[in-house]
UniProtKB/Swiss-Prot annotation:
Residues 259-333 form the POU-specific domain. The gene is POU1. Residues 351-410 bind DNA. This is POU domain protein 1. It comes from the Eukaryota. Its main location: nucleus. PANTHER family: POU DOMAIN, POU DOMAIN PROTEIN 2, ISOFORM B-RELATED. It is found in: Nucleus.
């Protein structure tokens, strides 16, 4: 809060807690102070809406109505015409001079007033609060008391009409008008009331009085008459709740009018109807997006049309896209009856090929052909297509899709290419001949030696010798029962036993063709523990007992 100390009949000094509240030049401060003439201190509130002071002030800012008649000619302590030294004030330059602007300002100068207003009245209570020239460029940015905004009251007209007239003072606002404020302004309007033209028609565009503002900058903003209006965050329009969905009105907040927006139910029904009509007319989502761009200049992607039909767009975007789709749907319906240019435009987009449905008996023939030969040649495809009365492309695509399906349902194993060639489509786990078995075992030992070298094991020879003793594989002529004393398993060419899915399938169907027996219990496991299991492991976990189905075992339980 700014305080003014009355120093004498010719000089005054201003002490302020705000640096921009008009301190004098420091070099002249000591010469102006006269302690013997200092009287009481008074407060100097400065309102941002200074021109509205002519409508009246709150009662706490001055004497009551009864006191005005008896004290109108009494000089209250403060800044009056008698206490102003115009010669001294004329030597003080304004901080924001129109010619000087922001340059060459002394370091010890913050803000200086040129002089008092020429037509200021001898009313010290009023003058002590409003003594700035209306042309001062910072008149709207001076300190403001807290109660100016907290009491939510405008300056009343009925107070100052008795003593102060608006025409006798210069307007302190940057925006000036010759019209008076309306006296029938509601008292419940606060300073945060939004500018709504329909409610207050008397608030008009005003003309600038300061050369810092030009016509172009004025056109970019709207000010009410001699007021700075803040947004009304408290009384802002509340969102409307429609069908359990929260949507905000998209109307103009200045005019106070809102558009008639569809509800969420309307959008949902339209999206459902649009999708049905589009499919019935034979157009894809990409066709609609391309047609909108060709007809109306707004190109939309297939994803946008898809999200509209699925109600995955925002409410605002759904409202914008709906009229365009309505126009397109109307054109599409009319073109179905009478061919127009719309058909030519729609024909430019790529048509989706119809989905081919294959009968059950034809599909069974294709399945049997696939089991015999999964990758038929072009000649085989042509002959099969002619036999089944299908297009060649349909048969080719079916075999491609069937091979992809086979990859998904059949587990892939890390085996040698030679072993892969021996696997048939119906029995992927076929047996090998004796020569192939010997080669497989030899490859397993070679891989074992390489792994030991990589890990830097010192007992390389010991493990290699024990590996020869631990495994003896022989081919069984007949299927092996799960109750067999020895454990049934299969050795792959890579030396790695298949995963648990294969082991379960192998045990359930008894198709395994190899038997692991005579395993040295004290032998050291190979570097790949999944490849071979000691006999004690199977006995300990009771994997094969009493003719029950073997359980899937965890590799981490191995000893």
């Amino acid at each position: 809060m700014t305080q003014v100390s009355h120093i004498g009949s010719s000089h005054f000094n201003i002490n302020s807690s705000i640096k921009t509240a008009l301190p004098l030049i420091n070099s002249q401060y000591n010469s102006l102070v006269n302690e013997s003439t200092i009287s009481s201190n008074i407060n100097l509130p400065f309102r941002l809406d200074a021109p509205s002071l002519f409508n009246g002030l709150p009662e706490e800012w001055g004497p009551t109505d009864a006191e005005l008649s008896t004290h109108s000619n009494v000089n209250y302590p403060g800044l009056t015409e008698a206490t102003i030294d115009y010669k001294f004030c004329s030597t003080l330059n304004s901080y924001f001079d129109t010619n000087q602007r922001f340059g060459n300002v002394p370091n010890d100068t913050y803000l200086m007033a040129n002089s008092m207003a020429a037509n200021i009245e001898n009313n010290s209570w009023h003058n002590s609060r409003y003594y700035f020239d209306g042309n001062h460029p910072l008149s709207q940015w001076l300190p403001v008391p807290v109660n100016c905004w907290s009491n939510n009251n405008y300056i009343r007209d009925d107070f100052y009409d008795k003593s102060i007239q608006e025409e006798e003072f210069k307007s302190r606002s940057v925006l000036q008008t010759n019209e008076k404020n309306s006296t029938n302004v509601s008292s419940d309007i606060n300073h945060y009331k939004p500018l709504i033209t329909d409610e207050n028609e008397n608030l008009k565009m005003t003309k600038p009085t300061h050369n810092l503002l030009n016509n172009d900058s004025i056109n970019l903003c709207r000010f009410p008459q001699n007021e700075i209006i803040m947004p009304d965050l408290i009384n802002a329009p509340s969102p409307t709740l429609t069908n359990n969905n929260l949507f905000y009105s998209c109307g103009d907040h200045r005019s106070g009018k809102t558009e008639d927006l569809p509800s969420s139910d309307d959008l949902e029904q339209f999206a459902k109807m649009f999708k049905q009509r589009r499919i019935k007319l034979g157009y894809t989502q990409a066709d609609v997006g391309l047609a909108l761009g060709t007809l109306y200049g707004n190109v939309f992607s297939q994803t946008t049309i898809c999200r509209f039909e699925a109600l995955q767009l925002s409410f605002k975007n759904m409202c914008k896209l709906r009229p365009l789709l309505q126009k397109w749907l109307h054109e599409a319906d009319s073109s179905s009856e009478s061919p127009t240019n719309f058909d030519k435009i729609s024909a430019q987009s790529r048509k989706r090929k119809k989905r081919t449905s294959i009968e059950a008996n034809v599909k069974s023939i294709l399945e049997s052909s696939f089991m015999k030969l999964s990758k038929p040649s072009a000649q085989d495809i042509s002959s099969l297509a002619e036999k089944l009365s299908l297009e060649k492309e349909v048969v080719r695509v079916w075999f491609c899709n069937r091979r992809q399906k086979e990859k998904r349902i059949t587990p892939s194993f890390d085996v040698n290419e030679q072993f892969d060639n021996e696997v048939s489509s119906t029995m992927p786990y076929s047996t090998l001949n004796d020569d192939r078995n010997e080669k497989t075992i030899k490859n397993s030992f070679e891989n074992h030696e390489k792994l030991i070298k990589q890990t830097g094991e010192t007992n390389h020879e010991q493990n290699n010798n024990s590996s020869v003793k631990r495994l003896k594989i022989r081919k069984e002529p007949d299927q092996i029962s799960i109750n067999d004393e020895n454990t049934s398993c299969r050795a792959e060419s890579s030396g790695i036993v298949p995963d648990t899915h294969y082991r379960q399938e192998c045990d359930n169907h008894s198709i395994c063709g190899y038997n692991i027996h005579d395993i040295h219990e004290s032998s050291v496991l190979m570097s790949d523990p999944v490849s071979f299991y000691p006999r004690s492991f199977f006995m300990k976990n009771n994997i094969y007992s009493n003719g029950t189905t073997p359980t899937l075992f965890d590799h981490s339980q191995m000893i």
